Amino acid sequence: MTKIAGLGDESYGYIAGQGSGCIINAIMASTDAGKKMVESELTEDIVNSDEFANAFKTTAKLDQANGSEHTTDDNGNLMAEFNTNGKVGVLFNGVWNASGIDASLTDAIEPALFPGNIAIASAGGGLAVANNMSDEKTELALEFIKYMTSAEVQEKIFTGVQANPCNTTVDLNALAEQSGDAATMKLAKACAQVNEADTIVIDMKYTWGSDVNKAIINALMECAVSGTDIDARFEALQKELLALIG
């Protein structure tokens, strides 16, 4: 952030707020204990843990230094400043955003993992088969899952949707070269980084819940305001989270 601010051209470090949730996620995943916490349901012990306190306060200090004007609860609100204007150094937005990059910035933008070679990767709700169906329906459901995860469909996930396919047999580099699109080639590089990361952790909103995720992001957005007492705001957040989990 210091180097970018030193450019003196109104550039800034990163899009905070929604993106700050990713920073907490990655900091938690940097230790075995923290990673286990993120991958399980939120409990009172986790809320009161040193790992969570360190992750929140470290992120809050970064957000405060980055500036409250660069904070949003939806990255889409500031997306153009990364994809089109090139005003922001880092966008925490996953591998799927390649199609939004302006052609003039394609050469300048590079994918990267979090420090410690950590990647956040989730399949969202994923694909599941309901219980208590007939054998015939279960067989059809499994056939559908087999099709959806096939190379044929997953190639389209990469080239059309521009997301990281779940089928690791798909040759992303070959597809990217075949497309001839520079942004798609960067997408292939980003997917490879995620798939080969030393630590791959789930997005905490899928384990801790969207309400908890929103509460954490709101607290961080408040901490981004200069002069906010981070310790006091964290204590308030702990009470909010304990109320949410019952």
Predicted regions and their residues:
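Extracytoplasmic/periplasmic solute-binding protein
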Residues: 1-44, 88
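Pocket-flanking alpha-helical
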Residues: 1-11, 80, 97-104, 242
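Glycine-centered hinge/linker elements that transmit conformational signals in sensory
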Residues: 2-3, 41-72
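Short, solvent-exposed loop/beta-turn-alpha elements that line the ligand-binding surface or hinge
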Residues: 13, 34-55, 103-104, 113-119, ...
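Short helix-initiation/N-cap motifs at beta->coil->alpha
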Residues: 70-84
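Paired acidic/hydrophobic, glycine-rich loop segments that form the ligand-binding mouth/hinge
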Residues: 89-94
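Extracytoplasmic/periplasmic substrate-recognition and gating elements
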Residues: 103-164
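Long, aromatic- and glycine/proline-rich binding clefts that accommodate carbohydrate-like moieties
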Residues: 159-218, 222
